[in-house]
């Protein structure tokens, strides 16, 4: 997105959606708070991305390979990456990420760096390229393509010989970032175990990140330490509450770092943080990350997927849902059906904004408190609220209470902490005519927010 259009969009929203603004104490001048780059904003606006764990583990029925796998086992005879992308798009996903190389070191593209790749497999007669088919499928379906490249490599003998392996890893990154056109996200895993020589590698993270910046300057870089987007601190798909998009970069300086403040920082961010680094919440639709036939009857329910949406996107994060291809190279039919049902369930919940056309007003009540009031065109029964800060101008809200009234007494619908890009609140079915959002605490003068109300389903 062009920076000028990004800023204009935020300004237009402020002008068009949140007036009138009423008085109150003027906000004091404060230092400029961190804001997202256009790439970070576009990344979060996707809301949903699909992870595809695929490789030799798919054929060995393991989660972590040890690097001794024979490439001959990799032969997904019916591989159809377009089927993956169609299922993702139909379910409302806007991006996909492929494990181009997992910890076993097997590369899904014909790399010059190792023989442990698809070029040594019988698939497509040794001339196949999963990464190429994946990227092309994403583009054909209008999805943004991302790539995961594990730095841990349990096959390559250079692993553990730091300078040599870091050179090789950067060569692999360079191949992926220069052969396949635009890449939207580069996903770095912090795993750092032993290689085939029993040694651990000292990763050159600044060099890895600069390689991405050199060849894909518009890509967002994911890792525990960003620098663009961060892990949410668990693999349950649950962002923290509160969840700030700002962090103190000195707390988590490299992926895989340990320390008492690391997980709290990943989960919650920091209201006083100096950099913008929003959270991505990763989780699998199945118990495992790779496909296992024994898990075919253990695909997440629609309600479980909806809960994940509320605990990730609904807590100012992005949901990265893993849906692993089978040994045939297809998404399993029950997974595809569950994705479609997940889309239908979301559509039912968010079908009609009860607050559309409501009379609204925004009042500053002090330097760091404010109220949003809504009066609906007619009484309605609501169960869900979506609240959004104009994050193009930063994140500020730290605590709020949402009240509702049917025209007489006011009752508390819900209480919350941070808002950010989006906060989704569920509350008992309540008939309302008026709504009042009271911002009780903020890290900076809060800007006018947007609220939508839904009956749910």
Language model: regions and residue ranges:
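Inter-blade boundary loops/turns of WD-repeat beta-propellers
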Residues: 405-407, 456
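N-terminal export signals
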Residues: 5-24
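Mature catalytic domains of secreted/periplasmic carbohydrate-active enzymes
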Residues: 8, 24-403, 412-417, 421-423, ...
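Short, conserved beta-strand segments of beta-strand-rich sandwich/propeller modules, principally
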Residues: 434-436
